[in-house]
């Protein structure tokens, strides 16, 4: 594993660090929005006094704190999309790979990074037993995951049930409802709500001090002005899902296909919302990372 000098120095000097995934760059957003957004999110973190650490794998080397040149090289290498279980394959076979939520969490934990910002977590897909590694990894890795809930292409109720089954601590940030990506808030209640980054830091500290393993999932809704109605998203979703099944797309290829197709069908509306919720999550992650340091 290679930890960049900037990230290594920040960790040694007690400067707040947040992890960022590379899948959003390689498979989550179309070019050139992917590269532009990745750069913008890193700049946001730096402006808030936090060092960003984009995580990915380049020709078999795990890199924590990818440079722009390394990101470009990874993209040019047609990277795999990997979860935790595929990390050994990518490393052993010297492949380039973009890390999903699960893989990014595991690598962040190994590197000593406590906070990770993403768009939305994976979960239980509609109509079958396709369950994301994100959930099982959250049962193991002691990392704060800031996300806009789960993606609306999933079975939200079953995803919430699986999070409970795997004993993942979930808190809503300034909300009592579980958020669902572009659509804002779902109808599903959350048991626990917090209203400050400091409270999130307190919960995480308590979790670690008690030796209770696993992530703290912070459900942070998309800002209201960028919410897209359930009815509108459902229309795009039904068409995209139908095309997905017709094309025989399965597994990890499903989510990037659906997100890309829905962006096309919405004339870029979902793309704008996706970028805004990422910015919102990075900002909160920065506040949490700083709160953890002031408590230390």
From Swiss-Prot:
Annotated substrate binding lies at 81, 101, 132-134
Under the heading InterPro entries, the entry gives: Indigdn_synthA-like, PsuG
For activity, the cofactor(s) needed are:
Mn(2+)
Cofactor: binding details: Binds 1 Mn(2+) ion per subunit.
Query: What is catalysed by this protein?
Result: D-ribose 5-phosphate + uracil = psi-UMP + H2O
Q: What class of enzyme is it?
A: lyase
User: Which GO terms are recorded in the biological process aspect for this UniProt protein?
Assistant: nucleobase catabolic process
In alphabetical order, the GO MF annotations are: hydrolase activity, acting on glycosyl bonds; metal ion binding; pseudouridylate synthase activity
Quaternary assembly: Homotrimer.
Protein family membership: Belongs to the pseudouridine-5'-phosphate glycosidase family.
UniProt protein name = Pseudouridine-5'-phosphate glycosidase
Q: What is the lineage of its organism?
A: Bacteria, Thermotogati, Thermotogota, Thermotogae, Thermotogales
